[in-house]
Amino acid sequence: MMTPQLILASTSVYRQALLRKLGLPFEYCDPNIDETPIANESAQALVLRLAQAKAEAGAKYFPDGLIIGSDQVAVIDSKIIGKPLNRDNAIQQLSQASGKTITFYTGLALYNAQTGEINAQVEPFTVHFRHLAASQISAYVDKEQPFYCAGSFKSEGLGIALFSRLEGRDPNTLVGLPLILLTEMLLSQGIDVLA
């Protein structure tokens, strides 16, 4: 059996840029799944379910692929927050986060469409926000417009100035694709990124 083609089941330019760091050829597709949370679903269960669903949805387009699915949410004050989608929501999310700790949960799934084998795990990452003035929040939102980023920031850009501390095993997790975990999963499928 030949090595399956690597597929990223995501249209996120941020996830694509992260995956390019590994130097492996890949294609991407839009998994186009229903991302509605189930009543009383925990953040970890939600991202695990959606990462698996995205990876499995990619098999429609690439039936012999090795498909990566990923999903991320942030939790603040025990509530799941997602992408703000507009300026007002972004300001509200960052105002709520000011001076607090937010945990991001990123679900990562690797689905071998040839064998039906799936490996799915959740990688946490914790962000400690500085105490931010309303003017700082507005200025940041206007400069980076993080409307499609969970938690309303881009940590790979100016968003780093919002934080006092980061905690986690892989900073790539915060951007949306835990590469350390992914390389471990790929190795279990016979793909060594260092070979």
Swiss-Prot record:
<feature type="active site" description="Proton acceptor">
    <location>
        <position position="71"/>
    </location>
</feature>
<dbReference type="InterPro" id="IPR029001">
    <property type="entry name" value="ITPase-like_fam"/>
</dbReference>
<feature type="site" description="Important for substrate specificity">
    <location>
        <position position="156"/>
    </location>
</feature>
<dbReference type="Pfam" id="PF02545">
    <property type="entry name" value="Maf"/>
</dbReference>
<dbReference type="GO" id="GO:0005737">
    <property type="term" value="C:cytoplasm"/>
</dbReference>
<protein>
    <recommendedName>
        <fullName>7-methyl-GTP pyrophosphatase</fullName>
        <ecNumber>3.6.1.-</ecNumber>
    </recommendedName>
</protein>
<dbReference type="GO" id="GO:0047429">
    <property type="term" value="F:nucleoside triphosphate diphosphatase activity"/>
</dbReference>
<feature type="site" description="Important for substrate specificity">
    <location>
        <position position="14"/>
    </location>
</feature>
<keyword id="KW-0546">Nucleotide metabolism</keyword>
<comment type="function">
    <text>Nucleoside triphosphate pyrophosphatase that hydrolyzes 7-methyl-GTP (m(7)GTP). May have a dual role in cell division arrest and in preventing the incorporation of modified nucleotides into cellular nucleic acids.</text>
</comment>
<keyword id="KW-0378">Hydrolase</keyword>
<feature type="site" description="Important for substrate specificity">
    <location>
        <position position="72"/>
    </location>
</feature>
<dbReference type="GO" id="GO:0009117">
    <property type="term" value="P:nucleotide metabolic process"/>
</dbReference>
<keyword id="KW-0963">Cytoplasm</keyword>
<comment type="similarity">
    <text>Belongs to the Maf family. YceF subfamily.</text>
</comment>
<dbReference type="InterPro" id="IPR003697">
    <property type="entry name" value="Maf-like"/>
</dbReference>
